[in-house]
Structure formats: C-alpha cells, structure tokens
Curated annotation (Swiss-Prot):
Its EC number is 7.1.1.-. Its cofactor is [4Fe-4S] cluster. NDH-1 is composed of 14 different subunits. Subunits NuoB, C, D, E, F, and G constitute the peripheral sector of the complex. It comes from Flavobacterium psychrophilum (strain ATCC 49511 / DSM 21280 / CIP 103535 / JIP02/86). One of its GO terms (cellular component) is plasma membrane. One of its GO terms (biological process) is aerobic respiration. [4Fe-4S] cluster binds at residues 45-46, 111, 140. This is NADH-quinone oxidoreductase subunit B. It catalyses: a quinone + NADH + 5 H(+)(in) = a quinol + NAD(+) + 4 H(+)(out). GO terms for molecular function: 4 iron, 4 sulfur cluster binding; iron ion binding; NADH dehydrogenase (ubiquinone) activity; NADH:ubiquinone reductase (non-electrogenic) activity; quinone binding. NDH-1 shuttles electrons from NADH, via FMN and iron-sulfur (Fe-S) centers, to quinones in the respiratory chain. The immediate electron acceptor for the enzyme in this species is believed to be a menaquinone. Couples the redox reaction to proton translocation (for every two electrons transferred, four hydrogen ions are translocated across the cytoplasmic membrane), and thus conserves the redox energy in a proton gradient. The gene is nuoB. PANTHER family: NADH DEHYDROGENASE, NADH DEHYDROGENASE [UBIQUINONE] IRON-SULFUR PROTEIN 7, MITOCHONDRIAL.
Length: 181
C-alpha cells in the first residue's frame, strides 16, 4: 500500500528520531481507510461468502476491518449482500441514515448491485435506487477474494477523500437526490 506520508530528517536543534511532514487529509484518510468497521446487511447467499471472507483463511482483519459491527451507529462501512425486496428498502435506508458520517456503502453481489436474477416487481433493481453506493462487487455470489478486493478499492477511495468532502455542497446535493438529510 502506498502512502503520501513521508518521514524526513528533523531540522537542526530538534531532538528525536524525526518528524512527519504531510497533509491532514492524508493522515486522516490513512487512519480511516485502515480502521473501517463493517456492518453486514446480508439477506442471501452473499452473506455466506462474507462469513468466509471474515474467517481465518481470507482474514479481512488484515485490512483494518477486524471489528464487525452489528449496530449502525458504530459502523462506517455498510456491506449490502443479497436480494433487497421493495418492502426491505425502507429498512435498508433507515440503517444507512442511522450510521454516522463518514459512511460508505459496498454493494456485494449481483442482487445488491442490480437485482440479480430476480427481475420482478417485488425486488429492488439495485440498492443505488435508495442509498448512494461507493463500490460495487460483481458476482453471484462473489468469491471472498472479490469481496476483499472491493474493500481494498473502498480503502483507496477513503484515502483519497478530502476530510471536508462530506460537508461539501456536492455531497449534500448527492444526499438530497436520495432525499436523505
């Protein structure tokens, strides 16, 4: 993993090993990216693959997602896995709204991304109809390696995000387009 944080020699007269010269955005982004707490919202077979992803063989904890949260108020990464019916959509939205900022969403699998094989009146054809999605993980169901890759892509996005992006007019406009306050 590359980082924009550089360790340089201390100026003369300053004691110690050295000091960091970097931007606040880089430090906060690095800390956020490597300490994400996932909230699994699993309704189908992708949830089984998530269990394998969290197990010792794939070990998502290596990437800073060690503590799985089952409370939206303590999570910052919502992982939606499986089919979401239209009756379940308001619940998914409520879970998203209960998460504190900054919050990110990964749509895991074909069902969460586009409705999958369930092209019917009762199934939501992609969770991006009710909440904003940051990363899509394809597959039916996706292998644990793909889920890990999706988390790593989200980490890259988080690292590059400005500290103040979440209070920007563009982000507020995005939330307003979903009717989220």
């Amino acid at each position: 993993m590359s980082s924009n944080i550089n360790i340089v020699e201390a100026p003369e007269g300053v004691t110690g090993e050295g000091f960091f010269a970097t931007k606040l955005n880089d430090v906060v982004g690095l800390a956020r990216a490597n300490s994400m707490w996932p909230l699994p919202f699993a309704t189908s077979c992708c949830g089984i693959e998530f269990m394998a992803t969290m197990a010792s063989h794939y070990d998502l904890a290596r990437f800073g997602s060690e503590r799985v949260s089952f409370s939206p108020r303590q999570a910052d990464m919502l992982m939606v896995m499986g089919t979401i019916s239209k009756k379940m959509a308001p619940i998914l939205r409520q879970v998203y709204e209960q998460m504190a900022e900054p919050r990110w969403v990964i749509a895991v699998g074909a069902c969460a991304s586009s409705g999958g094989i369930f092209d019917t009146y009762s199934v939501l054809q992609g969770i991006d109809k009710v909440i904003p999605v940051d990363v899509y993980v394809p597959g039916c169901p996706p292998r644990p390696e793909q889920i890990v890759d999706g988390v790593m892509r989200l980490q890259e996005l988080v690292k590059s995000e400005s500290v103040r992006r979440r209070s920007s007019p563009e982000y507020q406009e995005l939330l307003a387009s979903y009717n989220i306050k």
